[in-house]
Amino acid sequence: MEKKAFVTKDMIEKIAEKYPTPFHIYDEKGIRENAKALKEAFAWNKGYKEFFAVKATPNPFLINILREYGCGCDCSSLTELMLSNAMGVKGEDIMFSSNDTPAHEFEYAAKIGATINLDDITHIEFLEKTIGYLPKTLSCRYNPGGYFSISNNIMDNPGDAKYGFTTEQMFEGYKILKAKGVENFGIHSFLASNTVTNDYYPTLARELFELAVKLKEETGAHITFINLSGGIGIPYRPDQEPNDIRAIGEGVRKVYEEVLVPAGMGDVAIYTELGRYMMAPYGHLVTQVIHEKHTHKEYIGVDACAVNLMRPAMYGAYHHITVLGKENEPCDHKYDVTGSLCENNDKFAIDRMLPKIDIGDYIAIHDTGAHGFAMGYNYNGKLKSAELLLKEDGSVELIRRAETPKDYFATFDCFDIYNKIDFDA
């Protein structure tokens, strides 16, 4: 698919007068259209709900847009629970899917009524001892092990993942939970990441639906929901095609009718926990070129770095780059596009063919709406950037200010050194 930026050079020049680069900017129109399409794709299931993966983009202004389309929150930590609660997301609208979970996080999840998704069979006893009881509704995360394949193509390796119950543990766990008074059960599974195929969800659904039927038959458990989690990806590269969410929803419906309905389980709700799919395409990291270097390679230095977008440095991930104002110029120059960290992997692109770039140019790095700002950090004392929302009417709203040196040094505020720092630097 063609990768086009949702901002222009003229727009960014105007925005940068008020909000200096680098910054993440999100497209409200795109977010809304996508959320609406997802809701429509699963409208056939009466209980369907998307629990947005807060870890992907933990910004309340963006999450509140999704809430207008019925989305809840998928949380994996205490602070994500705290944020969701502060936003007014309550009870069953929060799914707490965690692993290696500290006791206090279970306590808080139970306190605010979140649905708890257990990652391990030993967590049954741990949860009961921690909060003094077991909730009437609980979910268990399933990991079948081995390789997960679609049409003989290996998609991922669940057997190497730290998450979830084995098949045997699912049956044992359900029996234990039922004996302890749990009344409503859920099944959760995440078996592949960033899949760019319409077949992932239907294939996963078949495996989970068939498991659900067996669990019901062998344990008598009342299964009220099946959570397909995340895994629907996006086309980061121009040579990839996007998923068709309507085809995906229809594929899941067909399997639902084939497997669950004949088993008398036609009332089971379908849940999803999408993050990347909901937000990634609708975010850009906008940065300005501040240096060029001509040595063994041609380098373009920008004012953003891996602090602002970690994925290329951490995973070698591809993020498309648009040189704003030069969209129609030939990509006949080969560059490494770099940040200023003291790490050689701080590169947004390596040997990337781009138009001729000049100091002062603005660059839009695509698909940063999920796992972009969220994965930021402060190595080298670098500060995280602002987040902006491009509204449907064309106006721009600040939805998170940029960090300041005072933020960076805040945890020293109880020590004498804090008062000696020159905050006017």
List PLM regions with ranges.
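A charged N-terminal "starter" segment
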Residues: M1-K136, K175-A179, E183, E217, ...
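Conserved, mostly hydrophobic/aromatic
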Residues: I31, K55, S77, A109, ...
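Generic beta-strand/beta-sheet core signal
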Residues: A53, S97, D119, R141, ...
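Flexible loop/turn segments at secondary-structure boundaries
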Residues: P58-F61, L83, P102, Y147-F148, ...
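Active-site loop/helix belt of alpha/beta enzymes
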Residues: T130, P144-I290
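ATP-grasp fold ATP-binding core
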Residues: T137-N143
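Charged (often Lys/Glu-rich) extended helix/loop segments that serve as interaction or gating elements
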Residues: L260, M265-A425
